[in-house]
Amino acid sequence: MMLMMLPFIGSVSVSESLVAMTTMCLVYLILKFFQTEIPEGLLRLPGPKPLPIIGNVLGLGSKPYLSLTDMSKRYGHVFQIQIGMRPVVVLSGSETVRQALIKQGDDFAGRPDLYSFRFINAGKSLAFSTDQAGVWRARRKLAYSALRSFSNLEGTTPEYSCVLEEHICKEGEYLIKQLNTVMKADGSFDPFRHIVVSVANVICGMCFGRRYDHDDQELVGLVTLSDEFGRVVGSGNPADFIPILQYLPSAAMKNFLRINSRFTEFVQKIVTEHYTTFDKDNIRDITDSLIDHCEDRKLDENSNVQMSDEKIVGIVNDLFGAGFDTVSTALSWSVMYLVAHPEIQERLYQEIEDKVGLDRMPLLSDKPNLPFLEAFILEILRHSSFLPFTIPHCTTKDTSLNGYFIPKDTCVFINQWQINHDPELWKDPSSFNPDRFLSADGSEVNKLDGEKVMAFGMGKRRCIGEVIARNEVYLFLAIIIQKLHFLPIPGEKLDMTPEYGLTMKHKRCHLKATMRARNEH
């Protein structure tokens, strides 16, 4: 993720603007006067010279991941820009990022205290919270444990190895029927519109023990809100980088608060219902598991980490929000690439037909036998890089990296897009080529090459749902490729241009899908 300055800050009077500008100029001059001294033996961070007040905003453009990649060619893998009045260190290069987030993980494990982050999940977000002490670690461990244990529970029937597989298979089957119905009625479909609801239903089943119809207005509204959230967070809030703007009216901030309030209200309502019907001997879903843990902690006088009801809402909100946005975006991009590369789509279908057959649905256990599908997914993550940045990190103490001094509380951006398109790592990185991940005979994926792809962060802030997300993308894709053939609309050009945001989506479009002949009944 990248946070950029936006020119819109609301309607303010001329006098208010003059006062704000004067104050910002004074603060800027004071900051320049007290510029950080560099310890002996370390170097000052390189980077472009910032303008007063606005910093290097004008040099970022509408595609900051590309602008910062270009800057890294000039300044190296560790350099500094200034966004508004906040210094930001930008890290790129696989080895540099690995050094920072893994080998020096404690130094870079923080989150910056950005104004807008305080309002995400009412400040209780695992992903965005500045907290990284004992309580945060306990909450993260709890969320990870609940997510993993419920996804691995046995399915309700022997044909499914686990609850996660059961949810995905049932939603995948429903998605195929839904797309077939839409095609017969309209002749085309919006890939994002239908995929995102199916994926949302998987995480709803895991978190809340319920599913929604594809036309359910509450769920469709929340999916729309999630899309808005990604765009707003991705485009940035000026008050995050020019603190005085926190006190001026802003239509963008008002919209941001509305989005977060709606999400919190939705989850709070469901958590409250779970408290009312909670039965310790019948844990139905992740929310029940978290409530059970909360109740145990309240009874345990020796527990040094208590879990409040508000923080349960925050954890569930995090899991719900992140649980469908990343997966649905990956799947939607996958369908676009299938249409853009019909020869790859046919090769994937042939692999599934040969290794799984057409008489049963693909399962998680088939994954090792479908190396080209796994390579295709890796190349989707690499080539699209729809997660161009991680959520910003922050240094927890004065530190150094590659010989450069980085003060405590410095905001740090990780440029995942640069790593995934680095010509030092990838041959012809601009080409879409799943074979780059396969062994010479095509029988298996090269694990070392696969690990070079950066999509979920790394280190102490790595996405806790990565394994589940990868399994979801794999199984949904295997199911729909087995049954459907995706095509462009005749005469229409496929637009693969990404739209910048927290997760980069492709432009909304319509495609065609036909049932594979041998699957028609």
Swiss-Prot record:
This is Cytochrome P450 1A1. Its EC number is 1.14.14.1. One of its GO terms (cellular component) is endoplasmic reticulum membrane. Substrate binds at residue 229. It comes from Platichthys flesus. GO terms for molecular function: heme binding; iron ion binding; steroid 17-alpha-monooxygenase activity. It is found in: Endoplasmic reticulum membrane; Microsome membrane. It catalyses: an organic molecule + reduced [NADPH--hemoprotein reductase] + O2 = an alcohol + oxidized [NADPH--hemoprotein reductase] + H2O + H(+).
